[in-house]
């Protein structure tokens, strides 16, 4: 069995039952653009907000007394396998930056404004002695050290302030994606346990502190202490540092953007909803696409698709956070390469995204109902794809990439052979050594051949994986109809797929392009896996569990 996704856990099962239908009276989630969810502030918190906004109010900073200080501390927890430093070492056209890295790039930094970046689990983080491990990718190993490090870095900033300078406020903002979003939630949870409520505000070591904003992309815990506990995932990986994901009341505003089409079973979602109710300091927004279509991190042309769809969630998060006072630079003032990562002005991209949003029949309602509405659109497209009625531009692109790579590899091999022929001696003569010039040409041809072989394998594997997922999907749809014919009650997931297959209305071409050119297939990372395109992942609402598959 060949498995390409390092987050894979062999034979993982979830033996604990959960609801297969929406929870009665569940709070509303929404789709795409929506005003932020911010709880009512106390008089003390309103005062602290004005203090925190000092650096972005014209001339306010100059007027502030130098005997006082406001510490602005923003921490960015990247997702599993995401590492800004590793990506920035690549050439621009191969970078796969997450939205967390892009937001960190856009954040201000000076003597009063501190931004701290925490690399994703499974990647190198020398500051905590983590070289990046398979256990980090699969089980979240090292997340606890990252959370502690973020708290230590905060304490270090406080310790830097001279004794004669009064700290007026510690202003905290936090961002995270995937397990990094779980780390961000654990960070504010642990911070809250160290704080005391006083006069309508909060104190940290007798210093005024506020957690102004938490920006989260698609929270996934999947935290395990050993491979054995990971195999039987009865609690979705809510272990050790990830035991409690409830956001503390001290967080003034939380925005959680979640992936409408993620299907992988071992990527259970942790909603910010608790049972049926949303706390007043949080809002959840569905965005189309799978996990990394929302949080970012796909490489350009991965699966023959663009990696630009995540820019819609990126810009939305930036706008809400900026309006809330998070100290981002104005986008127009960012350096060119950073600004380019926010660009969503491509006409085809915008047309496809807008057409998709228009096609979603239910954009606001309980999370489960809105999820079903998004899934119905995707399954209408899958129905056409597996029937061959929808021309697959992404597959055609992969075929071109594969064929071009094969030609380039063959040309490089021919070049190597020609250089070797230059060295042929007479019969019985010793073959002479390469000259420096020949060695240089041969090494260049070898590199070209190896790179081309890698690109060929990548494109060919993607085509193979996509094809096998389509076959399994057809079997699953047939099973739904068989179950119904036997008088078995269908779940919300099964009813949604069946309704999509029986919907005879044509799917707009722009919606097809959305799925085919921009939205990825996260299940197809594997040559074999228990996850299927017909699956919906489990969603946790605190201690409650929606298990549609």
Task: Please tell me what each predicted stretch does.
Residues 2-549:
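Active-site- or binding-pocket-proximal scaffold segments within functional domains
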């Amino acid at each position: 069995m060949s498995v390409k996704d390092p987050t894979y856990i062999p034979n993982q099962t979830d033996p604990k039952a959960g609801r297969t239908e929406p929870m009665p009276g569940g709070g509303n989630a929404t789709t795409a653009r929506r005003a932020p969810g911010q709880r009512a502030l106390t008089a003390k918190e309103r005062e602290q907000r004005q203090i925190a906004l000092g650096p972005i109010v014209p001339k306010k900073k100059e007027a502030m007394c130098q005997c006082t200080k406001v510490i602005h501390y923003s921490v960015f927890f990247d997702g599993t396998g995401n590492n800004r430093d590793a990506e920035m070492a690549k050439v621009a056209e191969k970078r796969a930056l997450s939205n967390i890295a892009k937001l960190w790039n856009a954040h201000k930094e000076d003597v009063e404004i501190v931004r701290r970046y925490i690399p994703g689990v499974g990647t190198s983080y020398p500051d905590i002695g983590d070289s990046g491990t398979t256990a980090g990718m699969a089980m979240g190993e090292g997340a606890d050290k990252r959370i502690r490090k973020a708290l230590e870095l905060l304490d270090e900033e406080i310790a830097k302030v001279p004794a004669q300078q009064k700290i007026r406020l510690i202003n905290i903002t936090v961002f995270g994606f995937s397990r990094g979003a779980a780390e961000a939630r654990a960070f504010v949870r642990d911070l809250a346990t160290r704080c005391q409520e006083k006069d309508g505000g909060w104190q940290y070591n007798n210093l005024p502190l506020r957690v102004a904003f938490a920006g989260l992309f698609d929270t996934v815990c999947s935290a395990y202490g050993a491979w054995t506990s990971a195999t039987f995932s009865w609690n979705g990986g809510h272990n050790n540092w990830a035991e409690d994901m409830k956001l503390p009341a001290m967080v003034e505003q939380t925005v959680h953007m979640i992936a409408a089409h993620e299907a992988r079973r071992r990527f259970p979602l942790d909603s910010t909803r608790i049972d049926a109710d949303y706390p007043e300091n949080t809002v959840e927004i569905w965005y189309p696409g799978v996990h990394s279509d929302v949080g970012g991190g796909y490489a350009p042309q991965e699966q023959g698709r663009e990696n630009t769809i995540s820019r819609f969630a990126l810009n939305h998060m930036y706008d809400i956070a900026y309006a809330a006072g998070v100290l981002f630079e104005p986008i127009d003032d960012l350096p060119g390469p950073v600004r380019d990562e926010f660009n969503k002005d491509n006409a085809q991209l915008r047309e496809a995204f807008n057409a998709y949003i228009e096609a979603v029949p239910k954009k606001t309602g309980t999370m489960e109902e809105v999820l079903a509405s998004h899934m119905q659109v995707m399954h209408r497209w899958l129905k056409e794809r597996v029937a061959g009625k929808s021309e697959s531009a992404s597959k055609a692109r992969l075929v071109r990439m594969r064929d071009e790579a094969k030609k380039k590899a063959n040309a490089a091999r021919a070049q190597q052979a020609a250089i070797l022929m230059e060295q042929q001696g007479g019969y019985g003569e010793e073959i002479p050594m390469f000259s420096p010039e020949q060695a240089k040409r041969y090494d260049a041809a070898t590199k070209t051949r190896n790179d081309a072989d890698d690109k060929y394998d990548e494109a060919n594997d993607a085509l193979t994986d996509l094809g096998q997922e389509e076959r399994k999907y057809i079997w699953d749809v047939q099973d739904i109809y068989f179950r119904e014919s036997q008088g078995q009650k269908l779940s919300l997931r099964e009813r949604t797929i069946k309704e999509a297959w029986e919907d005879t209305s044509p799917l707009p071409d722009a919606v097809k392009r959305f799925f085919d050119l921009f939205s990825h297939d996260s299940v197809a990372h594997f040559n074999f896996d228990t996850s299927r395109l017909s699956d919906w992942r489990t969603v946790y609402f605190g201690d409650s569990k929606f298990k549609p598959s």
